[in-house]
Amino acid sequence: MKFKQDFFTQLPEFYSQVYPQGITKPEWLAWSDDAAQLIGLSQPTDELLLGLSGNAAVDGATYYAQVYSGHQFGGYTPRLGDGRSIILGEAIGPNGAWDVALKGGGPTPYSRRGDGRAVMRSAVREFLVSEALHHLHVPTTRALAVIGSDLPVWRESQETAAITVRLARSHIRFGHFEFFCHSERGRADKLIQLLNFTITQHYPHLSCDAAGYKAWFLQVVQDTAKMIAHWQAVGFAHGVMNTDNMSILGDSFDFGPFAFLDTFQEDFICNHSDPEGRYAFGQQPGVGLWNLQRLAQALTPVIPSDDLIAILNQYQEALVQTYLRLMRAKLGLSAVDVPSVEQDKQDLDLIGRFTVLMEKNQLDYTQTWRQLGKLDPTSKHSALRDDFIDVSQFDAWYQSYQQRLGAVADIPTWQTERNSVNPKYILRNYLAQEAIIAVEEGNLAPLHLLQKILTQPFAEHAEHEDLAKRPPDWGQGLIMSCSS
């Protein structure tokens, strides 16, 4: 890997230099060829294993942990920072630079009495979801590899340590800006320094002046809205949408007790530390705006409040238009009619009625959408009908759907198009758990198979139909913890 060190050299007050503590008996548990290409790597090597496990220096790496703050479950925590993630620098790839971070690399000045380690189960889950979201076309950070070890660590019980090698276009979070506004009061110079760095690195078409700052914040608002619209479309619940887990670039970031929906449930909670459902699936769009409002508060020394409010008011439109584009494609409505305010309203109603029917009939979200690929949209009798208990309500919806859809000249092509946007395979929690159990038993094959399938989620994979099934009784509604 070839590194540049722009963050390290230009923002010395934004991090602490710290070196990883190596894990014992490191081994490759998983590797992403796709992610490796981003930073010019090909195959995993023994030399790379030593470096990324913290047991040898990586040429050109500087090693540091960033400082930031954030709102966690609605309350402000003035000092957080990378408690178990150590960044090596920005690796230069064929199409840009990517931060390389060792998540689970050992304690840092921000570990807050923690051991700085990640356990194998959380490392595997983060690896799988990073790559799964990418191949579902959801903006996300990436995962290069998972490195296992025999190092014992204690959570609720004894587990083994592991490292996820994360790749990110940037690790700058909403919480970075909050830290230098609230926790370091009077440091508007540092806030401006961070803002100028972010624009120069990631928005080079913008200027570092008043007009550029407003244009940048609008881009952040729109990118955040688009990311969350993608989550809602694929049925993804993040679980811990604290502001310190929000990427300034609108990439899905910092995965813990996440889940994809099995049975559709608007108020689905995937995090057992969130009993009131602050971060429930259906709350995510509202939380996204709330988090942007907290970012806006941090930017008041730089951008006038009236301008910030005006820009925040554009969030809903960006969210709705992205969501409509994605959902119209899922339903096959993309090329039908010229969008208008009234058409948007009608389409949102059509989509909402369909998801309400899914919830009332306890249908699997992913499977129900996938069934559209078998549908003859010109037939009066839908193949979906048998899945619904309340057939009269379905019939009413289906009639509205056919009216909106209009004529379909080439049914096989229409069906193929539906299968190209409605995945057959998602990372169901029970599948991740089965892969983790197999790794604990020394069997990596289920993990590697699951990774392979998730990189082609729209393909049929007829020989692996079992990975598309609804969860068994023990795997339904699994709620994960933040323990990692």
UniProtKB/Swiss-Prot annotation:
Catalytic activity as recorded in UniProt: L-seryl-[protein] + ATP = 3-O-(5'-adenylyl)-L-seryl-[protein] + diphosphate; L-threonyl-[protein] + ATP = 3-O-(5'-adenylyl)-L-threonyl-[protein] + diphosphate; L-tyrosyl-[protein] + ATP = O-(5'-adenylyl)-L-tyrosyl-[protein] + diphosphate; L-histidyl-[protein] + UTP = N(tele)-(5'-uridylyl)-L-histidyl-[protein] + diphosphate
Requisite cofactors: Mg(2+); Mn(2+)
Protein name: Protein nucleotidyltransferase YdiU
Function of the protein: Nucleotidyltransferase involved in the post-translational modification of proteins. It can catalyze the addition of adenosine monophosphate (AMP) or uridine monophosphate (UMP) to a protein, resulting in modifications known as AMPylation and UMPylation.
Organism, scientific name: Shewanella baltica (strain OS185)
Catalytic machinery residues: 244
One protein family per Pfam: SelO
Enzyme Commission number(s) from the entry: 2.7.7.-, 2.7.7.108
